[in-house]
């Protein structure tokens, strides 16, 4: 751990110089764009599939338009070419894609080439020697700190806010773009690649859209770059970067940081071509355009190095250049250090925090430590670390500092769900949501209830499975989270209930279980964390475990082969096939709906876009 030790030594000497980044915040809310009226969420689907007759029409519709949206239709390629058509005078790779891809040759090359040779090998030390001079030359003292942070809701379950009438207001345009790109809109999968938000962004930022060309600032482009970067659409990011140059919008440090982040993501993909030349191109381009590096640039470039010698050299030069040590940099160093001895590394990090490590202890650090320990199957130690930081939150009285969030909870739930421990999942869920000590209570998200359903499925076919499923759905509704019909684990639960159980859950049992679960938490019915819930719990705890179906396997009722209730193997196989067909049918409907929504766009993109935004009430001028 050379880089980690060097950083630890520097922190011991200059701990007061650690920066968290700017504390100045700018909050952008969905309500700002909604006004006093709301759009009704009861519109009919584009394709109705409620009856057998309509399902036949639905299937026929897709077959008749397979040449527009099916295999070989090149639908996405045509959309991209249409978007790039105003930039025809500039050389862009996707303006003219030839159908010369040799699938057989590619498949053969994939089979015969060893996995460890898929990436073009390059020395990490050579890369450090190449990039350090460029970074040093582009670093202006004092090194700039990250820009003002903006706060967004992570997800939103209602309709997308309508497109406002900007009337030349650049700030309004920037805020609307920022909201669409940083908040995930779950309603009708609006933020997905096939949703309405990518279409809105393309219209607003289209090269031929003269109404918004004067409103497009570098901040708008950076937000859209970030949106497509999250979707791993690196080609669109490169095209937007080229469009910025064509329109005379000068990129800034954040622009290059996002492009460098794309390369970091590429490093972890199995590619034959190296990213070295592309990395050097961006750094030289920064120097050519007079764009200075900030702490984020240095932190991002650190992630390209993959051995301790180059990392140690990099940290040494970073300190010599006077680059402030940010909590993000410390996080990168810790995350990329060896995971061979996770417990030893955790102790080293906790010692490095010291008694007053407030300057760089943050949410990402806590989640990293807990995740490492849980992956090492040291869940008891992970819970001790959680309790340590839970109490540490109380020290930040004047300026509350949140060190625990829903991702922390989901880390534990993910581990318990994999083992089918629904009792531990509910104990953990209730503790985080209701009994956590600190300035905030944790709000569950979609992944939280996915993990509860996974634990229910992994727990096996118990008598109470339908009731527990209804309880999970009821808990999710309390937070305005609708269980997805095509979610993997929810769909699996529904298939099991439909074909394995003769009757659905009883409302009385559901209400009783919900009431019992109110006090089912660590610190209440179980004073200390333990994985042996049945053994260490009292009679009330065991009763709740029975209602959840979480009974130790040796104590579960087993059916003998001679019993009448025993189902033969052929019947089990038949039920299994029915469940699989049921899940596949729902997946097919979901895929078919997505394809059907593309049909009008394949015929007339602009008219179809206008029809959809009008139908959903997304034009503020028409409301």
UniProtKB/Swiss-Prot annotation:
Membrane topology: Peripheral membrane protein
GO biological process: mitochondrial translational initiation; mRNA metabolic process
PPR repeat feature ranges: 217-251, 252-292, 362-396, 405-439, 445-479
Record flagged with keyword Hydrolase: no
CC terms in the record's Gene Ontology section: mitochondrial inner membrane
InterPro entries the UniProt entry points to: Pentatricopeptide_rpt (IPR002885), TPR-like_helical_dom_sf (IPR011990)
Subcellular location: Mitochondrion inner membrane
Pfam families xref list: PPR_2 (PF13041)
Keywords: Membrane, Mitochondrion, Mitochondrion inner membrane, Repeat
Function as written in the Swiss-Prot or TrEMBL entry: Required for respiration.
Protein name: ATPase expression protein 3
Source organism of the structure: Candida glabrata (strain ATCC 2001 / BCRC 20586 / JCM 3761 / NBRC 0622 / NRRL Y-65 / CBS 138)
Gene it is expressed from: AEP3
């Amino acid at each position: 751990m050379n880089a980690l030790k060097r950083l630890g030594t520097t922190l011991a000497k200059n701990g007061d110089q650690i920066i968290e980044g700017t504390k100045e915040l700018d909050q952008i809310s969905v309500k700002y764009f909604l006004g006093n009226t709301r759009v009704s969420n009861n519109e009919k689907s584009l394709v109705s599939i409620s009856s057998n007759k309509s399902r036949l029409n639905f299937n026929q519709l897709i077959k008749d338009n397979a040449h527009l949206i099916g295999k070989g239709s090149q639908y996405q390629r045509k959309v991209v070419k249409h978007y790039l058509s105003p930039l025809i005078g500039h050389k862009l790779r996707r303006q003219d894609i030839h159908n010369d891809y040799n699938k057989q040759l590619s498949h053969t090359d994939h089979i015969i080439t060893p996995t460890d040779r898929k990436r073009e090998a390059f020395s990490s030390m050579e890369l450090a020697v190449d990039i350090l001079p460029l970074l040093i030359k582009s670093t202006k003292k004092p090194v700039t700190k990250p820009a003002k942070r903006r706060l967004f809701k992570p997800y939103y379950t209602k309709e997308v806010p309508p497109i406002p009438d900007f009337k030349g207001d650049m700030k309004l345009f920037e805020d609307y773009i920022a909201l669409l790109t940083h908040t995930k809109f779950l309603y009708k999968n609006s933020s997905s690649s096939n949703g309405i938000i990518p279409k809105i962004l393309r219209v607003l930022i289209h090269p031929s859209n003269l109404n918004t060309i004067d409103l497009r600032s570098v901040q708008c482009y950076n937000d859209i770059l970030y949106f497509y970067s999250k979707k791993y659409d690196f080609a669109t990011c490169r095209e937007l970067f080229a469009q910025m140059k064509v329109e005379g919008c000068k990129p800034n440090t954040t622009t290059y940081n996002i492009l460098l982040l794309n390369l970091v993501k590429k490093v972890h993909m199995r590619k034959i071509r190296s990213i070295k030349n592309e990395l050097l191109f961006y750094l030289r381009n920064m120097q050519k355009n007079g764009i200075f590096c900030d702490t984020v640039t240095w932190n991002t470039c650190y992630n390209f190095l993959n051995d301790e010698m180059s990392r140690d050299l990099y940290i040494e030069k970073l300190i010599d250049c006077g680059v402030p040590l940010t909590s993000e940099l410390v996080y990168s160093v810790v995350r990329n250090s060896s995971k061979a001895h996770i417990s030893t590394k955790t102790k080293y990090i906790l010692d490095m925090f010291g008694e007053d490590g407030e300057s760089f202890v943050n949410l990402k650090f806590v989640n990293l430590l807990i995740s490492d320990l849980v992956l090492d199957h040291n869940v008891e130690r992970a819970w001790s670390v959680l309790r340590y930081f839970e109490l540490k939150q109380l020290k930040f009285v004047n300026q509350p500092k949140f060190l625990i969030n829903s991702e922390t909870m989901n880390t534990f739930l993910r581990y318990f769900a994999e083992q089918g421990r629904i009792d531990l999942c509910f104990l953990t869920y209730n503790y985080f949501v209701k009994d956590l000590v600190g300035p905030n209570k944790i709000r569950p998200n979609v992944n939280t209830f996915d993990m509860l359903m996974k634990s229910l499925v992994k727990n096996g076919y118990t008598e109470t499975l339908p009731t527990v499923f209804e309880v999970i759905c009821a808990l999710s509704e309390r937070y305005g989270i609708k269980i997805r019909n095509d979610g993997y684990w929810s769909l699996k639960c529904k298939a099991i209930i439909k074909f394995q159980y003769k009757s659905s859950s009883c409302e009385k049992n559901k209400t009783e279980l919900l009431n019992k679960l109110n006090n089912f938490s660590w610190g209440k019915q179980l004073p200390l964390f333990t994985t042996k819930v049945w053994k260490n719990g009292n009679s009330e705890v065991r009763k709740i475990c029975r209602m959840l179906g979480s009974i130790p396997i040796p104590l579960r009722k087993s059916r003998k082969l001679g019993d009448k209730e025993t189902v033969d193997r052929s019947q089990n196989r038949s039920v299994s096939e029915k469940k699989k067909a049921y899940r596949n049918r729902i997946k097919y409907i979901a895929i078919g709906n997505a394809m059907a929504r593309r049909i009008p766009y394949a015929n007339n993109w602009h008219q179809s876009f206008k029809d959809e935004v009008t139908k959903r009430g997304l034009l503020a001028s028409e409301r």
